[in-house]
């Protein structure tokens, strides 16, 4: 599995309160394919009809993901927090900047440094 982490990753309040070192370790463990319970990853969908996917980090241990590229744009401690906190902030930021919610363009621009947080 190839994983990239977007610049200025969106984090839930829980992750924002953790030491940066611990957050970096969690991200490294996801990249290395280690089991990470209680972590939900928000990533860019590779489906042309979808924008984002919210999945538990342990899903990436399945063989299906070994050949996929995952671009992580956010982390949360639960699905509800991913939707009610992180996704709401993403939507607000994207809409303020572009007047729409085209997350694929928004995060591509963030990855390229064309958009700051």
Residue ranges and their predicted role:
Residues 70-114:
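Short, compact, well-ordered microdomains
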Residues 33-70:
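Short aromatic-glycine-(Arg/Gly/Cys) micro-motifs in beta-strand/loop hairpins
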Residues 6-10, 55, 73, 102:
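N-terminal functional modules and adjacent low-complexity/disordered segments of proteins
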Residues 16, 21-23, 49-50, 55-57, ...:
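Mixed-charge, polar/low-complexity N-terminal
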Residues 9, 13, 39, 63-64, ...:
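Intrinsically disordered, low-complexity N-terminal regions enriched in serine/proline/glycine
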Residues 15, 114-117:
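Long, low-complexity intrinsically disordered regions enriched in Ser/Thr, Asp/Glu, Pro/Gly
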Residues 1-30:
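Negatively charged, low-complexity tracts enriched in Asp/Glu with abundant Ser/Thr
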């Amino acid at each position: 599995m190839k994983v990239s982490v977007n610049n200025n990753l969106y984090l839930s309040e829980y992750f924002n309160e953790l030491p940066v070192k611990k957050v970096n370790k969690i991200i490294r463990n996801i990249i290395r394919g280690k089991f990470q319970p209680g972590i939900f990853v928000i990533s860019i969908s590779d489906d042309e009809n979808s924008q984002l996917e919210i999945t538990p980090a342990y899903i990436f241990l399945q063989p299906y993901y070994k050949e996929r590229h995952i671009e992580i744009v956010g982390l949360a401690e639960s699905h509800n927090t991913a939707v009610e906190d992180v996704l709401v902030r993403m939507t607000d930021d994207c809409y303020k900047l572009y007047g729409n919610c085209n997350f694929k363009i928004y995060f591509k621009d963030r990855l390229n440094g064309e958009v700051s947080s």
